[in-house]
Amino acid sequence: MSEPLQELGNYIATKRADCVLAWDVTNKELNLDVTPSNIVGLVEFLKTDATCRFSTLIDITAVDYTGRAKRYDVVYHLLSMYQNHRVRLRVSIREDQMMPSVISVHPSANWFEREVFDMFGILFSGHPDLRRILTDYGFRGHPLRKDFPTTGYTEVRYDEAQKRVVYEPVSLVQEYRQFDFMSPWEGAEYILPGDEKKE
């Protein structure tokens, strides 16, 4: 299975050398590291080229690497139902950088890009309706960023007295604690009766 993917990787890297920075095959999937400026052209090429025929955009997501200058990897998953191949496109961008929208090539990218914006705060230029899709209207922050607090900023509850939903700052019943989840049986060296004589 990896030999056809190797050939496909070579083919794409040769045809689109303007945007493919590197590629490899991992877990029977082709991974391409690409430049953000040419992502729309590459996705269109992968969809329309007779050799590739990646007609289905499965998902768009992102990964937050807080320690890097290019903080985010925006990841596109494409499927060729004709060739039974998958490709993963990785685009590394800075926190203040915008990604071009691929809605013109894959209309299904509309909600995927809105989800990435909502969860990570990554903006997509050319998107017709870039607003939150999973969090509430007045939600503050982007929950899948590594710097977002695990408790959040506000809690939402229904107030019986006011007969409406209210937003309040998070108030923890107890101080935030770090729990040690290490099993007491892992890593311990127990000396059983009779074993002390062996030493």
Curated annotation (Swiss-Prot):
Compartment annotation: Cell inner membrane
E.C. number: 7.1.1.-
Family annotation (InterPro entries): NADH_DH_suC, NADH_quin_OxRdtase_su_C/D-like, NADH_UbQ_OxRdtase_30kDa_su, NADH_UbQ_OxRdtase_CS
A cellular-component GO term for this protein: plasma membrane
Any one GO molecular-function label of the UniProt entry: quinone binding
Catalytic activity: a quinone + NADH + 5 H(+)(in) = a quinol + NAD(+) + 4 H(+)(out)
Coiled-coil regions, chain positions: none
Region forming the signal peptide: none
Lineage top rank: taxon: Bacteria
Matching Pfam families: Complex1_30kDa
Key words of the record: Cell inner membrane, Cell membrane, Membrane, NAD, Quinone, Translocase, Transport, Ubiquinone
SUPFAM superfamilies given in the database record: Nqo5-like (SSF143243)
Topology relative to the membrane: Peripheral membrane protein
Keyword DNA damage applies: no
Quaternary assembly: NDH-1 is composed of 14 different subunits. Subunits NuoB, C, D, E, F, and G constitute the peripheral sector of the complex.
Function text: NDH-1 shuttles electrons from NADH, via FMN and iron-sulfur (Fe-S) centers, to quinones in the respiratory chain. The immediate electron acceptor for the enzyme in this species is believed to be ubiquinone. Couples the redox reaction to proton translocation (for every two electrons transferred, four hydrogen ions are translocated across the cytoplasmic membrane), and thus conserves the redox energy in a proton gradient.
Protein's name in the database: NADH-quinone oxidoreductase subunit C
